[in-house]
Amino acid sequence: MMIKKVERFFKSDAAGGIVLIAAAALAMLLANLNATQELYTGFLSTPVELKFGALEIKKNMLLWVNDALMAVFFLLVGLEVKRELVQGSLASRRQASLPVIAALGGMVLPAALYLAFNFQDPITRAGWAIPAATDIAFALGILALLGSRVPPALKVFLMALAIIDDLGAIVIIALFYTSSLSMVSLMVAAGAIAVLAVLNLCNVRRVGVYILVGVVLWTAVLKSGVHATLAGVIIGFFVPLKAQKGHSPAGTLEHALHPWVGFLILPLFAFANAGVSLDGVTLAGLASLLPLGIIAGLFIGKPLGISLFCALAVKLKWATLPPGVSQKTILAVGVLCGIGFTMSIFIASLAFGDVDAALVTWAKLGILVGSLLAAVIGYALLRSHLSRAP
């Protein structure tokens, strides 16, 4: 009886989101209990080294999760978005343009709101990109809690929006927060992308070949100084989708990756990244301009930017809403996109890490509060609206 209940749980649409939230809650608990704090941080700091001839990759456990395992998640997202671009709800130009326009609004307005609070301070002004990011893993995890009530087109819209948002964040990091890029590694990455394109054009249908070239691409992107998860999206876009003799390489790979991503990779990601220590944090500090600017950017700027840009695009006939999706739903999804979390924390560490550790702490507090508000209110709005939908 118990086994059947467990099986039913893992087959439910909301299971992945529940496991993700549980892993995040456990991480917060371990990171803030005196008895487990050192054990938790020690585990994430454990160095793991990979050597292959002259190639050497040495990262701690946290970075292996974020750079390697999350590339697999982005591979799955790339496969799903490609399918929708070719066959599904993003197949027309006007439908595909909506998440691009939404992502632009979701980056511009949060950054502007942050600067409204912090423009006068040349030090905190450098953190303008912190609220421009969206944590796609947590946003999709919260959406998964709503199960089958979520229209497929809405999930695809959120995935596409978040991918473009992430690409924008990667470009921002490369242009404004990275001191040097390895041109040799970027050239190797470009060569790997060219090989993937040739494989696709020649209709090579063995998934293993794409994965092999993808490993080279991931390594090159990692060594270049650009966020390595970008490689996953690129690989996903080149794996052939068209079915022949009832077999679609992209479809088969997508089906195989789903349980691993939902019940292993994303919970590990949540466990590794959600453990933000609250040592030294006071509620009084929340009134300072740095965290206030981040909270305003994530919780107010994100939904306003996304919904306003979408409404304008639809009014000007530049884009159309996905089937079964209304402007109210777009606003609710915009709130959910205010979950900046890991990408926002990463940008905060780049902006303030070499300046003042206290600024990083206050930025993390703002990110945590803003992301939590976005998650709770976004979930409540979507649940309410989707429950009333016909």
Swiss-Prot record:
<dbReference type="GO" id="GO:0015385">
    <property type="term" value="F:sodium:proton antiporter activity"/>
</dbReference>
<keyword id="KW-0997">Cell inner membrane</keyword>
<keyword id="KW-0813">Transport</keyword>
<keyword id="KW-1003">Cell membrane</keyword>
<dbReference type="GO" id="GO:0006885">
    <property type="term" value="P:regulation of pH"/>
</dbReference>
<feature type="transmembrane region" description="Helical">
    <location>
        <begin position="330"/>
        <end position="350"/>
    </location>
</feature>
<dbReference type="GO" id="GO:0005886">
    <property type="term" value="C:plasma membrane"/>
</dbReference>
<comment type="similarity">
    <text>Belongs to the NhaA Na(+)/H(+) (TC 2.A.33) antiporter family.</text>
</comment>
<keyword id="KW-0406">Ion transport</keyword>
<feature type="transmembrane region" description="Helical">
    <location>
        <begin position="181"/>
        <end position="201"/>
    </location>
</feature>
<feature type="transmembrane region" description="Helical">
    <location>
        <begin position="126"/>
        <end position="146"/>
    </location>
</feature>
<dbReference type="InterPro" id="IPR023171">
    <property type="entry name" value="Na/H_antiporter_dom_sf"/>
</dbReference>
<feature type="transmembrane region" description="Helical">
    <location>
        <begin position="221"/>
        <end position="241"/>
    </location>
</feature>
<feature type="transmembrane region" description="Helical">
    <location>
        <begin position="362"/>
        <end position="382"/>
    </location>
</feature>
<keyword id="KW-0472">Membrane</keyword>
<keyword id="KW-0050">Antiport</keyword>
<feature type="transmembrane region" description="Helical">
    <location>
        <begin position="14"/>
        <end position="34"/>
    </location>
</feature>
<comment type="function">
    <text>Na(+)/H(+) antiporter that extrudes sodium in exchange for external protons.</text>
</comment>
<keyword id="KW-1133">Transmembrane helix</keyword>
<dbReference type="InterPro" id="IPR004670">
    <property type="entry name" value="NhaA"/>
</dbReference>
<feature type="transmembrane region" description="Helical">
    <location>
        <begin position="280"/>
        <end position="300"/>
    </location>
</feature>
<keyword id="KW-0739">Sodium transport</keyword>
<feature type="transmembrane region" description="Helical">
    <location>
        <begin position="61"/>
        <end position="81"/>
    </location>
</feature>
<keyword id="KW-0812">Transmembrane</keyword>
<feature type="transmembrane region" description="Helical">
    <location>
        <begin position="97"/>
        <end position="117"/>
    </location>
</feature>
<feature type="transmembrane region" description="Helical">
    <location>
        <begin position="305"/>
        <end position="325"/>
    </location>
</feature>
<protein>
    <recommendedName>
        <fullName>Na(+)/H(+) antiporter NhaA</fullName>
    </recommendedName>
</protein>
<feature type="transmembrane region" description="Helical">
    <location>
        <begin position="156"/>
        <end position="176"/>
    </location>
</feature>
<dbReference type="Pfam" id="PF06965">
    <property type="entry name" value="Na_H_antiport_1"/>
</dbReference>
<feature type="transmembrane region" description="Helical">
    <location>
        <begin position="256"/>
        <end position="276"/>
    </location>
</feature>
<keyword id="KW-0915">Sodium</keyword>
